A protein has these predicted regions:
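Acidic, glycine-rich flexible loop segments
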Residues: 111-187
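Low-complexity, acidic/polar, glycine-enriched regions of mature
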Residues: 154, 192-194
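An ectodomain-focused feature that recognizes extracytoplasmic/extracellular
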Residues: 25-133
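C-terminal motif of bacterial Sec signal peptides marking the signal peptidase cleavage site
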Residues: 20-21
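Bacterial N-terminal signal peptides that target proteins for export
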Residues: 1-11
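Exposed boundary/loop context
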Residues: 2-3, 38, 46, 115, ...
């Protein structure tokens, strides 16, 4: 009798978990083309950058090999755009994070101070300008993408800029100078719920 009760209890738990998993799968939001593969659903994302110093790199990534995220800077003083390149088989990946000062959602701007961080994921190496006085976004444009209604808004963000000072490791023992950068990436902004 105890075995039957245990078997029924186990079967009931399995059925409950299966129903819950199916319900969760039905309510999960569908992946957009941009998040399923590549940076932008339109297929025209890119990052070009000339990097000199501790490493010499000429980056030329196209939409399908990139991962793009972004939104407001944590302090609300502008926008943050993160663009990662193709992941290597050993998990290593190069990521650029641009913190663009004084830029509002949807605005086309020029001559904006920019903080730049270059991250070598999987290698524990990070280079940062540690301020927005070494890099400048010459021009920046934004174009609304995706659904127009609802609390979430997505923007295609295109920028062209340069750095006059290097990004350094936190210990200061190595430096990278990104003499030129051009990118088209994405930011996603969400309205906060009332009362927050």
């Amino acid at each position: 009798m105890a075995r039957k009760t245990l078997a029924r209890g186990g079967l009931l738990a399995l059925l409950t978990a299966s129903v819950a998993a199916c319900a969760a799968a039905d309510t999960a939001p569908p992946q957009t083309a941009a998040t399923a593969k590549g940076c932008l659903a339109s297929g025209d994302g890119y990052l070009r950058a000339r990097v000199r110093g501790a490493l010499d790199l000429d980056v030329n990534w196209r939409n399908d090999e990139m991962e793009c995220t972004g939104g407001s800077r944590p302090d609300g003083s502008g926008l943050r755009v993160s663009i990662a390149g193709p992941a290597q088989s050993d998990g290593r990946r190069l990521r650029f994070v641009f913190g663009i000062e004084g830029t509002a959602e949807g605005a086309a701007v020029g001559q904006r101070p920019t903080n730049l961080t270059v991250i070598f994921e999987g290698e524990r190496r990070l280079f940062a300008t540690q301020g927005d006085d070494k890099c400048t976004v010459d021009t920046l444009t934004q174009q609304r993408t995706g659904p127009l209604g609802g609390p979430k808004r997505s923007w295609r963000i295109e920028a062209h800029g340069f750095c006059v000072g290097p990004a350094a490791t936190l210990t200061g023992d190595a430096r990278l100078l990104v003499t030129r950068f051009d990118f088209a990436g994405r930011i996603d902004l969400t309205d906060e719920a009332p009362g927050k």
